[in-house]
Amino acid sequence: MPDKFKRVHVIVMDSVGIGEAPDAAKFGDFDVDTFGHIAKHVGGLKMPEMGKLGLSNIREIDGIKKAEKPLAYYTKMQEASNGKDTMTGHWEIMGLYIDTPFRVFPDGFPDDLINQIEEKTGRKVIGNKPASGTEIMAELGEEHVKTGALIVYTSADSVLQIAAHEDVVPLEELYEICEFCREITLDDPYMLGRIIARPFVGEPGAFVRTPNRHDYALKPFKPTVMDALKDGGKDVIAIGKISDIFDGEGVTESIRTKSNMDGMDQFIAVLDKDFNGMSFLNLVDFDALFGHRRDPQGYADALVDFDGRLVEVMEKLTDDDLLIITADHGNDPTYSGTDHTREFVPLLVYSPRFKNGGSELELRKTFADLGATVADNFEVKMPEYGTSFLKDLK
């Protein structure tokens, strides 16, 4: 390719897998297919923009026509790392191989961990289940205020959260408790991605979180492509939970989002900025609101809504832009349980510069090929892991 792209935009549709990975059984997953099963469930998906890019050329999806002349280069990527969680997927996309998976606790944390927290703090633990923070605060907040017990909960991700009223557990104490939890969960058997302090105030029936949240994350164990870009003087604009996933490493600007649609609003606003580097967007609602909750209809509606926003995105792209759409794992809402699913993820790569459209790329054996391509484009330090496909984009 003659000239490099000035801007690369990566959109991660969180959990939008495109069919069972060859090693899915090792992860307890059988006949999983997020995109395919959602499309079947609703009698076909209406996603004309993704269709034009070449989504059904990767493999046929009910309701989405195969493009005769796809606008994008297309293929699917296979995860190499030993995990199927958000952090593993994103870290691999940016050039790391993860051998030990981060742990998730869909049934709450083991007694041994809870006992350690109770012994260290002298406080009982209540909750200990996956929950929405606002819901568990409403459910257990009054008991917490009366007894001083700690509200401990998790989510579908690798996280331990502790909610406490600021008048019951002073902030300093809450932070110390979270630091202790961070220390004891760095390795197996817990290996948690993040500990979060969730302070709140108010009266029963009217509890509200305060801005004093504090995250104790794991930093990536090696520099990622984002670090290479930042060190090379390039912009790395993280939108949504990207900055949290990388604990701020390699990020030059972080933009928070409230929802998928807000994420698309923020992303489209970033397209109007003059920058040289990468924008990196995570759309978490697919996973958090519909995948884990096993809601195929809601998931389908969210996919259709996303597709509708691509019209605005495409209008703003120039020959200096490269758009990459992918996912970080699967989360088949028609499958049993509530966990992620081990799947291939789609890869669509588009630029208005491709005057003759795109074509099929080789199957990628690791998500890290995406990061390697970004590094190659900006001529920064290449990751140890991953092979660039930049030269295949004509």
UniProtKB/Swiss-Prot annotation:
Q: What protein name does the entry list?
A: Phosphopentomutase
UniProt-listed GO biological process terms: 2-deoxyribose 1-phosphate catabolic process; 5-phosphoribose 1-diphosphate biosynthetic process; metabolic compound salvage; nucleotide metabolic process
Its annotated pathway? Answer: Carbohydrate degradation; 2-deoxy-D-ribose 1-phosphate degradation; D-glyceraldehyde 3-phosphate and acetaldehyde from 2-deoxy-alpha-D-ribose 1-phosphate: step 1/2
* GO annotations of cellular component type: cytosol
Q: Catalyses which reaction?
A: 2-deoxy-alpha-D-ribose 1-phosphate = 2-deoxy-D-ribose 5-phosphate; alpha-D-ribose 1-phosphate = D-ribose 5-phosphate
By its UniProt entry, which InterPro entries does this protein fall under? Alkaline_phosphatase_core_sf, DeoB, Metalloenzyme, Phosphopentomutase_DeoB_cap_sf
| Pfam families recorded | Metalloenzyme
Function according to Swiss-Prot or TrEMBL: Isomerase that catalyzes the conversion of deoxy-ribose 1-phosphate (dRib-1-P) and ribose 1-phosphate (Rib-1-P) to deoxy-ribose 5-phosphate (dRib-5-P) and ribose 5-phosphate (Rib-5-P), respectively.
This chain's source organism reads Listeria monocytogenes serotype 4a (strain HCC23)
Annotated Gene Ontology MF terms? magnesium ion binding; manganese ion binding; phosphopentomutase activity
